[in-house]
């Protein structure tokens, strides 16, 4: 029913500032009765991290920062949901306004600054869903004023790993000063070693993933993928939002706002980086493709570039939750048209071409 209501609600939501509209959406989802997700085409199933994903279409971090509506989101048909980002201590993030729509570009700019209710609140909610169906992961970061950011990631891992299927180490948000410095090889090596050790000490089997910035140079990507392989990282999420502003943006006045750009204009940049990442790691580290997915064609391109799973968020602002089913149906049709019974043969098959042309 929520799919059918979105076209009616969209003008009302878009008449509000973007953050208020989002807060109302979260509130509305929290009021929905429990709903089993629709059955998925068996050809869309993906085995990854020791988990059976019913379909490859996930919700990216940032939508449900407080882990308040993960089950409602799974009920909309997502194959998995990533909650967060979460930091140890509650923090308000940057001053409002801090999120901006670019409707003609089908894009969003945000500078939230990892606003978070903190580790205790999110851990309690994730613990409370123990035994429920559905794959939920969590994105973790560091407090803006932290004296020891590495310790922040360790604290989040130790507390949250027992309650999730995967933990995504976020060192690529552009909205926390100095956070991307942790992508440097020496810092990253130490960080990942500590996070993996904290996961192991917790007794959890949660996979540890690393989220990459789209603005990284290829030399930096070489170092980052080598570090991820060395430290046994089980997945790479490609990519976060970009600080770049493509010349093609129509909403030029809004484009001047600082923050990370997501949505359709990020598609080419993030898909090229995804393909470049696949060319470096192949099947040794599974990839999750994120950035500009707003159709089955875009999701298919991410898979051809090397993604086993995909995530979206910004497109929901414009297309609503019905987009999830539209993408899944489109992927199923593609597989049937090619006579395939799974997505596995498609993963990375065009990575070399897409690294050049996306």
From Swiss-Prot:
Q: Which Pfam families match?
A: DHO_dh
| GO molecular function per UniProt | dihydroorotate dehydrogenase (quinone) activity
A single GO BP term for this record reads: 'de novo' pyrimidine nucleobase biosynthetic process
For this entry, the protein name equals Dihydroorotate dehydrogenase (quinone)
Which PANTHER family does UniProt cross-reference here?
DIHYDROOROTATE DEHYDROGENASE (QUINONE), MITOCHONDRIAL, DIHYDROOROTATE DEHYDROGENASE (QUINONE), MITOCHONDRIAL-RELATED
Q: Which GO terms describe its cellular component?
A: cytoplasm; plasma membrane
Q: Which keywords has UniProt assigned to this entry? A: Cell membrane, Flavoprotein, FMN, Membrane, Oxidoreductase, Pyrimidine biosynthesis
Q: Which residues bind FMN?
A: 61-65, 85, 139, 170, 211, 239, 263, 292, 313-314
- Catalytic residues of the enzyme: 173
Cofactor binding, per record: Binds 1 FMN per subunit.
Q: Which residues bind substrate?
A: 65, 110-114, 170, 175, 240-241
> How is this protein positioned relative to the membrane?
Peripheral membrane protein
CDD domains under this entry?
Answer: DHOD_2_like
- UniProt keyword Membrane present: yes
Pathway(s): Pyrimidine metabolism; UMP biosynthesis via de novo pathway; orotate from (S)-dihydroorotate (quinone route): step 1/1
Family the UniProt entry places it in? Belongs to the dihydroorotate dehydrogenase family. Type 2 subfamily.
EC assignment: the record states 1.3.5.2
Reactions it catalyzes: (S)-dihydroorotate + a quinone = orotate + a quinol
Q: Where is this protein primarily located?
A: membrane
Q: Could you tell me which InterPro entries the record lists for this protein?
A: Aldolase_TIM (IPR013785), DHO_dehydrogenase (IPR050074), Dihydroorotate_DH_2 (IPR005719), Dihydroorotate_DH_cat (IPR005720), Dihydroorotate_DH_CS (IPR001295)
